[in-house]
Amino acid sequence: MCIEALLKDKEYDRAVDYVSKISKGFFKERNAINTNQVVVNAILNTKYEEAINKHIVFVFKVNDLSNIKMEDEDLVVILANLLNNAIEACENCIGKKVIKFKFMMEEQMIILSVKNTCNQMIIYHNNEIATTKMINQDENGVGIKNIIRIVEKYNGEYVIQNDEDQFYFSIIIPL
């Protein structure tokens, strides 16, 4: 709310100072991942640092996403949900904790995939993915549903695969 108020009052320098102060020390390596897309960089670097702090190996492959034709809000929903789920699954994993992430534009397509170690199979309820979270069971798989809705909005396709020790979510969206 404070940032919003500063921006509405056109207090841009104060907003930048405020954000800088509250985020100081939030993560050490601000630009470990650079896609040339500010929103994507912010999410990926934040989640990368979170994973590293939780002793999760985070392997990534990205390229220049500066010309991506997706709304920022949609990018946030997809990336935040996929990476939050991957980090949570790895945290609960016994043994190796690894996230492999790919987000690239190639051959007139957006390709995004997340593969992570896990300890359990996907739970389905009424042909939909159900959450394993103990918090608010009424929100079964809301994040995944939102991802699928956005993929369909852009006429894309997705694949979800799972076995006892790995989860894989892949998205292809035509440019």
PLM regions: where:
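Short beta-to-alpha transition helix within the HATPase_c
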Residues: 17-24, 36-53
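Glycine-rich nucleotide-binding loop
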Residues: 120, 163-170
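Glycine-rich/acidic phosphate-handling loop/turn and adjacent ATP-lid/helix
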Residues: 110-141
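Short beta-strand/loop element within the Bergerat-fold HATPase_c
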Residues: 96-108
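Conserved short strand/loop->alpha-helix "switch" segment adjacent to the catalytic nucleotide/phosphoryl-transfer site
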Residues: 32, 58-79
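Conserved ATP-binding N-box helix of the HATPase_c
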Residues: 72-95
